Amino acid sequence: DRTLRVLCGWRYKNDIPSESKFSRVFKELSALKIAQKTHEQFVKEYLRDTLFFYNASDATKIPLREKPVKVEKEKFKPKRRGRPKKGETREPKTPSILQQQEDMKTTKQMLSLVSTQCGVGRKQNSKGNFETWIGGKLHISVVDGDIPITAIYSGANVHDSSVALPLINETSKKVSYLYDLQDAGYDSNIIRDFSKKLNHRPLIDINPKNSKELKEKIQLIKDEKKKFEILNLTQSLDTHHYNQRSMVERVNKYLKEDFGCSNIYYKGATKVASVLAFGILSVCIHQSLKMVT
């Protein structure tokens, strides 16, 4: 592509560097986190003084052509049911990543518990079917106008809720907003309390888990919403606010369909995160220009 070549600064074909040099330079750019730093600077320079209504968070799968790192599972020790015997001490349950993050103050501390190694992920899609993939996950926070503010890369086997607090914490530092919008995968009082602590209003969908009563209640609410939509009636304010969460799904679509994040051939978390960061930066600038015009 002659136009692209000239735009990149190479007038003649012979000026284009070799593939090996491209690879070395990209490795250096990835190590320096050029894309991530540029994205942070852009948000700081042009979006910091804007008040946004919503911050929607979600994670999307990132399939990779890489072998997953084997995780050694602890041998299961069967526990005796009932109360412990007199003088018997039982080991307390290991707290989840989210529970450990609750008492941490910095994003760096929180992310120290999150793995970036290639893993095997399993997620339920919008149709209720489970999808399995090898690779990682991209966790993003998006504000009004489909503008991504924060992006964090993790292994595929990391639960969405494990990156919720770092996302909220980082986004709150960068811009001002009112509502935190998240799906049922983030249903936790720890996340709600953290959001309120930063003066936001959390709107998080309920995860029924194994409760039949909750499942029936959620189904009734969904049926009611459909009737309201058919009759074109005004729904509750919370429903209206929560429906804005679709903007994070649109950004995931832009990244994969328009900005080259659907097929990543690099290996290693640093390079993969850099590719995704360039995509996030492009979407951020593109959508910000739309908002201005």
Regions flagged by a language model, labelled:
Residues 23-197:
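Polybasic low-complexity intrinsically disordered regions
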Residues 8-9, 48-49, 173-174, 238-240:
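Short hydrophobic "helix-edge" motifs at membrane interfaces and signal-peptide entry regions
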Residues 16, 20, 185, 271-275:
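An alpha-helix initiation/capping motif
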Residues 1-2, 143-146, 260:
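Short connector loops/turns at beta-strand edges and beta->alpha or beta->beta junctions
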Residues 184-257:
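Helix-centered, glycine/charged polyanion-binding patches within enzymatic domains
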Residues 230, 234-293:
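Basic, amphipathic alpha-helical segments enriched in Lys/Arg and hydrophobic/aromatic residues
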